[in-house]
């Protein structure tokens, strides 16, 4: 369980995209179970790994279609579990059409928090073993963020979790911190040690 910290433009999002196989490293290589990520079948990667990026989008179509993109066989139980985890279930329950509620292109008309929790639910439906989250609580208020943290604590188990975040509360989910600056890793260590060095209260 790792947090990636750094200022805007430090390279956090780029690193997550490289880990997800969406960008190719110009130097060095990304290894997954000691195998170069470039040698792995992209279909296997997509099945085992989920990335919530800042550029993720909702499209014109029903809630169900948006949530099951890439997982058309997902059951209503799978969908409800993911919605509960992300915190989006109350929003869906308020819609009289439920999962048939129509989403506008880009999620137009939804709040930033609603879009974010729906995109997170889309990722969680597939129950990936490796979870990459880029600022997952950036659009959430403190209450929604606290709910998400508690849900992820219970769900994450033995999965690999890597979070890029500016929000101190999210550090409750990790035991290791990597600090980036201008595309380079400048600190890497146990959470408590890094926070002490940074002068932050331990989470």
Please state what every model-predicted region is.
Residues 5-7:
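The feature captures the beta-strand-to-loop junction immediately N-terminal to the Walker
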Residues 20:
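Helix-to-loop junction immediately C-terminal to a conserved catalytic motif
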Residues 28-35, 45:
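Conserved ABC transporter NBD signature motif
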Residues 31, 64-105, 149-150, 158:
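ABC ATPase nucleotide-binding domain helical subdomain, centered on the C-loop/LSGGQ "ABC signature"
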Residues 131-134:
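Catalytic Walker B motif of ABC-type/P-loop ATPase nucleotide-binding domains
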Residues 142-143:
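Helix N-cap at the start of a conserved alpha-helix in ABC-type nucleotide-binding domains
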